[in-house]
Amino acid sequence: MTFKSRDLSRRALLVAAIVLPTACSHTPPPAAATALPPIVFVHGNGDTAALWVSTIWRFESNRWPRNRLHAIDLPYPLARDDDAVEQPGRTSTTEHMQFLAAEVEKVLRNTGATQVVLVGNSRGGNAIRNYVANGSGAAKVSHAVLGGTPNHGVWADANVLPRN
């Protein structure tokens, strides 16, 4: 082997040592994080957004960006005894849906996404179903996951409630 060919081999080896690890590494492009849809978690009757902490941790541990995970807190999470009659500290089905719609709009605006995934528990699932079926949600929701959602709503029966 001549001096020139040995020098060329060293250069080729050096270049390969620098270029190959970079060329072979798999780094997702920055746009990959925005390709994941934002998820909005909706709690149930009488709950809070804290219900979703461990679920959000699970998504984060699977590399879902934290800025695409949103647990919302409903201002008055309890359902009214009678949906048509105002009751202090409680919301109607319509008010619940309107609050969810406003939160979805905020998430869409803040993330630049065109659709969200909604995940609901109990009464939160009712709000999601109502938003998709009767609100403006059909075009803004790509997927809905409803867990423990009562099919006929949340209601109270005065004959069943304990008397004080």
Describe the residue ranges of each PLM region.
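Short, surface-exposed "cap/lid" segments of acyl-processing enzymes
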Residues: 33-71
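Serine-dependent carboxylesterase/thioesterase catalytic core
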Residues: 40-43, 72, 76-90, 94-164
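Hydrophobic residues on the short alpha-helix immediately C-terminal to a glycine-rich phosphate/catalytic loop
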Residues: 17, 55, 130-132
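N-terminal secretory signal peptides
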Residues: 1-8, 12-23
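Bacterial Sec signal peptide processing site at the extreme N-terminus
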Residues: 24-36
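Short, flexible hinge/linker loops that cap or flank conserved catalytic cores
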Residues: 7, 31-34, 110
